[in-house]
Amino acid sequence: MNEIVGDLWHEHAAGAVVAITTNGMVTKSGKSIMPRGCARQAADRYPELTRLLGSLLINHGNHVFDLGRKLVSFPVEEDPYRNPEMRLIEQSCRELVELTDYKGWQKVVV
């Protein structure tokens, strides 16, 4: 792991997979709630993500998912209006490592 400072989307454009910090909430219409930070930026860039992630959350729970487009969800909280949960962050770290190994990704930026 290397710590870098920079723009997630610059790294994404350069070929890195970007892990988007997310929560487990879904609207009545089945869309994930992506209200701020890199989740909001991703939803603004790729509007279909809210429906895709919402469907995955409904069917599989709050986990790391390959969302396509070199994007993955990285759950940090169950509810966007509460503090991030260490238990969930640890789970997401384990799942991201497994997915990265499985996919053979060379660079993932969180």
Model-derived features with residue positions:
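Macrodomain-like recognition of ADP-ribose-binding/processing modules
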Residues: 1-109
